[in-house]
């Protein structure tokens, strides 16, 4: 197969704009799968991807298409995730392509995440083909959306393809546009082999399977290959294509995208973004930089039953095999026992990992409040990264604390502008820009602390705009802030899993609200339970969960008051003794309450 007949392309879109459905139609149209094997969202292989209707891991498929010019082309589709947390996955997928289909919902128009992905594609110099999807909807306005694409993104949308992935309209036009407009890959077959790892996943029988784009040379089964980033050598057992079913072949040549199976046991040895070459004839340099995924949000995961600790450890190991952006380390908590401090790309990533642990591995988990990475300058001049409120040094040992700030792009219908601006201001945001994309839609830019976004900002934004707002954000820098650690004491003992780092201005309010919430959630015991919120040793709020008590004077009937008093005093002394030895069970909901306090 000559390079001229290969096209590598990806699909970029906002969540729910019909990307995976379009991929299904392309697979169906080119006959890559029989009718019997077709199911909705073929490329979304995880149950949770299908249920939530989102793509998490980048997947890939090789299609053979006979074009109108009579030639047969090989089209390599690399599917990309569309959610803000998975931008790193998108950038890897785009690096392996020469072109991209930009899918925009003809009813909803350009969304924040569409913009972010388009800019990524333009950075990689890709040929972008705009496609207006869902044109069969009664609310579709293709002309308005065309203007939006031209005004907001600056792409020429006069030749944008009108399509409907659901009813199969415009699929052939899309395939023809890919053949005509996407440039063929460049590559030298005689040069030393050089390939980029686009994705890696774990197969129970084959070990780690890596999806790679070959730039130069040939990778043959039976050769020894080297992963240059980690410096590991492996015998190459098999190579193959995904059609989307794995099909083995003898070799992968320059320009092609395929799977590499080398019996690798650990995913960390086949890092995404690494360069593969052969040991016999290595290439001179690695492909330009891919950074390892950086965790932005940290949370503690603990098993409800401490006997499940080993199961949780195994489950995290298995998930980390398939998810290079998840990292974790062992953590112990006096309140919750043994568990793990896990790092995630963002809030959605965290929810998905948690859901997969509970669903696929049948674990009951307690999750602590998520925190971002704070930076502290200590009095001895050292800079320290704080991933958990428990790591924060005391006030006497720190000079200042810095927290990460993000630039948030929010697209919102004009009628909801007021509440959205109020929400951003409440979350310590400062407005940077505001522009009308159309008569009814506004794009606003806010700089705000990331810690204010990780809690429940996205949920609040969606609910106050009836689901019409879209959000995209990226990290700006670290800035000094007046932050304090808020502790919750139960009967005088701090519960580390309930500690949070908050801004001083709202710390009093948060403390009061959290104490009230705890009072509601902690079950009544046989003795009084004091719930206190404290900052740096100073108690700022207190609530008492009243004791359950038996009516000890019920059997007295008439008689002297001193008799009743004696019984009550005796009960009081008993409760006091009980309080000294009694342990308070804190229910799972109490740990989640930290997230819900507004």
Swiss-Prot record:
Q: What is its EC number?
A: 3.6.5.n1
InterPro entries, from UniProt?
EF-4, EFG_III/V, EFG_V-like, EFTu-like_2, G_TR_CS, LepA_C_sf, LepA_CTD, LepA_IV
Keyword field contains Glycosyltransferase: no
Gene Ontology BP term (one): positive regulation of translation
The organism's place on the tree of life at top rank? Bacteria
Assigned GO CC terms? plasma membrane
Pfam families listed in its UniProt record: EFG_C, GTP_EFTU, GTP_EFTU_D2, LepA_C
GO MF annotation list: GTP binding; GTPase activity; guanosine tetraphosphate binding; ribosome binding; translation elongation factor activity
| Main localisation | membrane
Q: Which keywords describe this protein according to UniProt?
A: Cell inner membrane, Cell membrane, GTP-binding, Hydrolase, Membrane, Nucleotide-binding, Protein biosynthesis
Identify the residues that bind GTP. Answer: 16-21, 133-136
Q: Which cellular compartments is it found in?
A: Cell inner membrane
Q: Which Gene3D superfamilies does the protein's record reference?
A: 3.30.70.240, Elongation factor 4, C-terminal domain, Elongation Factor G (Translational Gtpase), domain 3, P-loop containing nucleotide triphosphate hydrolases, Translation factors
* Residue ranges of every copy of the tr-type G domain listed in the record: 4-186
Cross-referenced PROSITE patterns: G_TR_1, G_TR_2
SUPFAM superfamilies found in the cross-reference section: EF-G C-terminal domain-like, P-loop containing nucleoside triphosphate hydrolases, Translation proteins
Which reaction is catalysed here? Answer: GTP + H2O = GDP + phosphate + H(+)
Q: What's its membrane topology?
A: Peripheral membrane protein
Q: What does this protein do?
A: Required for accurate and efficient protein synthesis under certain stress conditions. May act as a fidelity factor of the translation reaction, by catalyzing a one-codon backward translocation of tRNAs on improperly translocated ribosomes. Back-translocation proceeds from a post-translocation (POST) complex to a pre-translocation (PRE) complex, thus giving elongation factor G a second chance to translocate the tRNAs correctly. Binds to ribosomes in a GTP-dependent manner.
| Family named by the database record | Belongs to the TRAFAC class translation factor GTPase superfamily. Classic translation factor GTPase family. LepA subfamily.
What is the designated name of this protein?
Elongation factor 4
Kindly list the organism's lineage. Answer: Bacteria, Pseudomonadati, Pseudomonadota, Alphaproteobacteria, Magnetococcales
């Amino acid at each position: 197969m000559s390079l001229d007949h290969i096209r590598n392309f990806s699909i970029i879109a906002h969540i729910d704009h019909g990307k995976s459905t379009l991929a299904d139609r392309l697979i169906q149209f080119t006959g890559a799968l029989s009718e019997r094997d077709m199911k909705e969202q073929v490329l979304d292989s995880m149950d949770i991807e299908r249920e939530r209707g989102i793509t998490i891991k980048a997947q890939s498929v090789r299609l053979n298409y006979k074009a109108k010019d009579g030639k047969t082309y090989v089209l390599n589709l690399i599917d990309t995730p569309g959610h803000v947390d998975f931008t790193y996955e998108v950038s890897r997928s785009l690096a392996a392509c020469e072109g991209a289909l930009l899918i925009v919902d003809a009813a909803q128009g350009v969304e924040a995440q569409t913009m972010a992905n388009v800019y990524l594609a333009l950075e990689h110099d890709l040929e972008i083909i705009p496609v207006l999807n869902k044109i069969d909807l009664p609310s579709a306005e293709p002309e308005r959306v065309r203007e939006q694409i031209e005004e907001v993104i600056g792409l020429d949308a006069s030749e944008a393809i009108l399509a409907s992935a659901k009813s199969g309209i415009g699929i052939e036009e899309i395939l023809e546009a890919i053949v005509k407009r996407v440039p063929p890959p460049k590559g030298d077959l005689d040069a030393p082999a050089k390939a980029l790892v686009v994705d890696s996943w774990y197969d129970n029988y084959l070990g780690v399977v890596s999806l790679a784009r070959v730039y130069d040379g040939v990778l043959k089964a039976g050769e020894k290959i080297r992963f240059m980033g980690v410096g590991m050598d492996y015998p190459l057992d098999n190579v193959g294509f995904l059609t989307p079913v794995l099909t083995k072949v003898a070799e992968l040549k320059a320009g092609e995208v395929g799977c590499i199976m080398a019996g690798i046991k650990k995913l960390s040895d086949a890092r995404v973004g690494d360069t593969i070459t052969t040991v016999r004839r290595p290439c001179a340099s690695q492909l330009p930089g891919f950074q390892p995924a950086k965790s932005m949000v940290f949370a503690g995961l603990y098993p409800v039953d401490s006997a499940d600790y080993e199961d949780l450890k195994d489950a995290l190991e298995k998930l980390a095999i398939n998810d290079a952006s998840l990292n974790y380390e062992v953590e112990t908590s006096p309140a919750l026992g043994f568990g793990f401090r896990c790092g995630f790309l963002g809030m959605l990533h965290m929810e998905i990992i948690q859901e997969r642990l509970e669903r696929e591995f049948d674990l009951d988990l307690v999750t602590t409040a998520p925190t971002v990475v704070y930076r502290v300058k200590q009095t001895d001049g050292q800079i320290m990264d704080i991933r958990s409120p428990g790591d924060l040094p005391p006030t006497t040992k720190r000079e200042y604390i810095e927290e990460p700030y993000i630039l948030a792009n929010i697209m919102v219908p004009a009628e909801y502008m007021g509440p959205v601006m109020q929400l951003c201001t409440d979350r310590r945001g400062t407005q940077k820009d505001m522009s009308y994309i159309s008569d009814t839609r506004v794009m606003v830019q806010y700089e705000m602390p990331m810690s204010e976004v990780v809690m429940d900002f996205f949920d609040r934004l969606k609910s106050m705009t009836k689901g019409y707002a879209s959000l995209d954000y990226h990290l700006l820098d670290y800035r000094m802030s007046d932050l304090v650690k808020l502790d919750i004491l139960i009967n005088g003992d701090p519960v580390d899993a309930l500690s949070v780092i908050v801004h001083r201005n709202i710390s009093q309010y948060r403390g009061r609200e959290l104490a009230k919430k705890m009072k509601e959630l902690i079950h009544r015991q046989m003795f009084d339970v004091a719930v206190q919120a404290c900052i740096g040793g100073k108690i700022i709020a207190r609530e008492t969960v009243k004791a359950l008590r038996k009516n000890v004077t019920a059997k007295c009937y008439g008689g002297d008051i001193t008799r009743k008093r004696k019984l009550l005093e005796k009960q009081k002394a008993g409760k006091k003794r009980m309080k000294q030895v009694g342990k308070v069970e804190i229910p799972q909901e109490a740990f989640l309450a930290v997230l819900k306090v507004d």
